C-alpha cells in the first residue's frame, strides 16, 4: 500500500486524528501534523507498539476474577404433569478464579496429611447457595460431589485446567480495558496486510466446574482443606432468616426454633392485645342503612350485615320476586329495610351535580341578547324556503327530497337586528326533535300554507309551543298562489285556540310569500317587537351554558356538536360538559363555516373536541377543570345504567305470558347508521312504531357515522337489514358485504325507509286464507259404478263445479262429509268443469253414502293479501 497521510490513516483505522497523533508520539515517532506522510515502516512500528501496550494491559490483570452465571429452567410441582403447577426456577452461580502465584505454596512446606476416612459420600451444595436462597426462595438446586481430597493430592490435570481457565477468563475481563487498542490493531492489520491470530474461547465443561468447587472459596477455606477438614455447608444466619421470611405461610417456618426460646416482644405484644372469642349479643342491632336511588339486593344485604337469601325471603313475603343481582329502586329498598328492623337513610346522589353548579363561575354582567326563533309547521309548508329568503341562500334546494330532516341553527343579521333561527323538520317522525326546538326557543313562528290549511303537524307544533309557554307568531305562507285562502287558515287555527289579534286574540298573523318575499319585512318586525316585549337578557361574562341542538360524527373532525349558547361566553380551550360526554373545545365553527374564538348568548356554533357524540337536547356547560368534568360524566353514565336496569320488567305471571306471546311473533332486525343524532332518533322511533302483535321491528344497533366492518359482522350474525341514512360504507365493509351477500340499503329520505320496512313487514305476516263457494250441485239420483262406487247424478244449480276441488256434502243444510271431488263426467266423458244448468255425474272420493236430495257444495281456498 502506498504512503498515506496521518489524516487518511485515521479515517481508515476509524479513530480521531488527535488520538492517532498521540499514539504515534507514544511509539517514538515524531508526528505533529495530520498532513504528514506515514510509510510502511512507521506503520509497523505503531502496530508493534499497540501490541505491546495490549499485552501489558493483559499482564496487569487482577489476581482474582469472579464470574457470575445464570440458568433458567421449569419444574412441574404435583403428582400429575398435566394437572401440576409449573414453577420457573432461576439458578445464579458465582465462581472466583485466583492466580496460582497468589496462593501461597504451603503444600510443599507442610507435612503430608493423611486423607480422612469417610464412610458415606458427602453432598456438597453449590457455592452460591446463599445467593440462591436469598434471591430464588422457591427451590434450591444442589449438586452431588465426590469426597473432597486434600489440596496436596490434586493432580496436575486439575492444575493445568485451572491455569487454562484462569487465562481465558483473565482475557475476557480485559476486553473492555483494551477495547480501543484492539480496534486500532485490527484496522492496522488490514492496512499492512497482516493477520493477527485470535484465540477462540472454549466453553467451560460442567465436569471442570464440579472439580474446582473447593478452589472457589477464600484462602481460609483452602487452608482448612489442607488440614483435612470437610467443606462446611454455607447456611448463614442472615440467609436463613431471609429464607424463613420468604417461605413462611401461616406462621410456619422452614427452620424450627429451639425449645425454650423466648418469644420476641412483637409476638408477645400481639398475644396480649389480641383476644379471640365470641360475645353473644344481648339486644338486636339496629343499623342505619344508606340507601341510594338504586341498589342491588346483594349490596342491600351487605349493608344490613345479613345474607342475601334473607332479604329475598322478606321481599317474597311482601309480594315482590327478586334475584341476588337484581337492581331495586329506592322506595322498595326503604320498605325492605324497615321490615327487617333497621333504619333507612335516604341519600341523594346528586351531590356531584350540586357541586358542579357551585363550581361553575357565575357572571354579573347582563346584556340584551338576540331572540331565538324556531320555525315550525307541517311538512312542505315552506319553513326552509322562508329561512332561505331571509338568509339569501339555497338550503332547501340541496336537501334530499326537498324536506328538512335535522335541525338547522342559523344566526342572521338583519338591518333591524340580529335573530337566531332554528329550522325544524315537519315530518311526523321528528316529534322529539321539534319538542327540543320548542324548549330552546324564545318565539315560535308557525308556518301554515294558505292553500293547504291546518295539518296534523301544525296542531302538534301548537301543542309543543304551549307546553314550552312560548309566544306564537303565525306566518300564512304561499300567498302568491291563486287558491290561497287566509281566512280558512284563521278559522281552522281559532279552533286550536290560536286567536288572531284582528279577532281580539293575542297572536300576531302575518301574510307572507317565501318565494316572492312578500311580507318578510313585516314578519321580522313582528319578531323584534315580540322580543322587545319579552325583554330578553343574558349574562355575558360567566361560564358558558347552552343546549345541544344536534350532533354528528364527522369523518375528519370526530364528534361534532351544534351548541346554542344561552348564557355566558364559550371560548376555544374551555372544558365543556355535555350530558355524558366532555372534552376540551378544540375549535368553534360558526353557521357560515368560519372559525371563531368565542360565542356569546343566542349564538349557535359547532363544537369540536368532545369525547363522543352527545345526545341532542343535552345541557352543555363549561366546567373549571377536566377532573370535575370526568367525575360528573362518569356519575351520569353510572346513574343512567342503574335506572335502566331498575326499569326492567318484574317477574310476574302476566309478564311471563306476554313474553311467551312475544316469542311467537316474527322479528325484523335492523342495523341503522345515520349522519346526525336527531335523524337517527327519528328513524328509530318511526320504524319501531311499525311493529304489530305478529311482526316486530327491533333496531339492534344504531349509531352516528359511516357503516363499518363491525356493523356488517353484526348484521350477518343477527340476520339483520343494514340501513345507511345519508352515510356510506367504507371499503372494508363493502368487500365483506359482497363476500357474505349482505345487501346495504342507502337512503336520503325518511319516507323511503318507512315504506320499504313496511313492505318487508307485510311480507313477513302469516298468510290469511278465505274459502269461497264456487258452485252447488243437487243430487237427483245415485248410480253404482264398479270402479268408483256410488255416482251421484246431479244438476248444477249455482256457479261452476270443478274437478279436484274440495267439496262438502250437505243433508238438510247440515255438513255430513267434507272431501275431494274425484270424478266429474258428462255423457260418459270426463270433463274439467260443469256450469250452471247442466247435468253431470259426480264421484266423491272415499264416500258412498250419497242420497238423492243432498247438496254438493264445491269451494276453493283463496289467499287474502294482508297489510299492516
Curated annotation (Swiss-Prot):
GO molecular-function terms, A-Z: GTP binding; GTPase activity; guanosine tetraphosphate binding; translation initiation factor activity
Localization: Cytoplasm
In this chain, the stretch annotated as G5 covers 513-515
Q: Which GO terms describe its cellular component?
A: cytosol
Binding sites annotated in the UniProt record for GTP: 377-384, 423-427, 477-480
Q: Which UniProt keywords apply?
A: Cytoplasm, GTP-binding, Initiation factor, Nucleotide-binding, Protein biosynthesis
Tell me if Protein biosynthesis is a UniProt keyword of this record: yes
Q: What is its main location?
A: cytoplasm
Q: Please give the residue ranges the record annotates as the region G4.
A: 477-480
The record ties this protein, via Gene3D superfamilies, to: P-loop containing nucleotide triphosphate hydrolases (3.40.50.300), Putative DNA-binding domain, N-terminal subdomain of bacterial translation initiation factor IF2 (3.30.56.50), Translation factors (2.40.30.10), Translation initiation factor IF- 2, domain 3 (3.40.50.10050)
Tell me the NCBIfam families matching this sequence. IF-2, small_GTP
Fetch the PANTHER family from UniProt: TR-TYPE G DOMAIN-CONTAINING PROTEIN, TRANSLATION INITIATION FACTOR IF-2-RELATED
Family named by the database record: Belongs to the TRAFAC class translation factor GTPase superfamily. Classic translation factor GTPase family. IF-2 subfamily.
Function (record text): One of the essential components for the initiation of protein synthesis. Protects formylmethionyl-tRNA from spontaneous hydrolysis and promotes its binding to the 30S ribosomal subunits. Also involved in the hydrolysis of GTP during the formation of the 70S ribosomal complex.
This protein's name: Translation initiation factor IF-2
